[in-house]
Amino acid sequence: MKSGGRAAELENAIEWLVLAGIVSHVYGLDTVKKPLDNYKNIDSFKIFVSDVGLLCAKNNVLANDILYASSELNDFKGGMTENYVCSQLVCRSYECYTWFSEGEAEIDFVLQREGKIIPIEVKSADNSKAKSLSIYTGKFKPEYAIKISANNFGFTNGIKTIPLYAVFCL
């Protein structure tokens, strides 16, 4: 939800869903500095469902549509993939944040790990160019960044590539 949305009206309901473990809050960051929690913008956040299966059931997405890469799902696939990654990160006890610059770039997840701030870009397609990650790394100079996609493991130009099936390894 962006600033000016209906977050204030829904605050109690959202908080209940978070405390029940049904959804996760991913707050936007005003700036990227340690500790990240001090720079979260409580008026700008994304909500992710904790169970991707429930998300698919709610949207009438069949297993065959996913298994056989139905082109009808192209618009839904990115959000579903981000939701899957968020649920895996939360299961590993990471506090997730997001970062965006107005109209220029958006990093799906930013987390603090072993004293480092790590940007994570999630791509659902094989063609996994990460323009936003390039903008972020140019601006904040992280030690490394992570791109999660359908591609295999790799490390190029300070970007670790991790396949979707291995997100639990983070």
Predicted segments with their positions:
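Short, solvent-exposed coil/turn elements at secondary-structure transition points
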Residues: 29-31, 53, 102, 125, ...
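Short catalytic-loop micro-motif centered on adjacent basic/acidic residues
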Residues: 98, 119-122
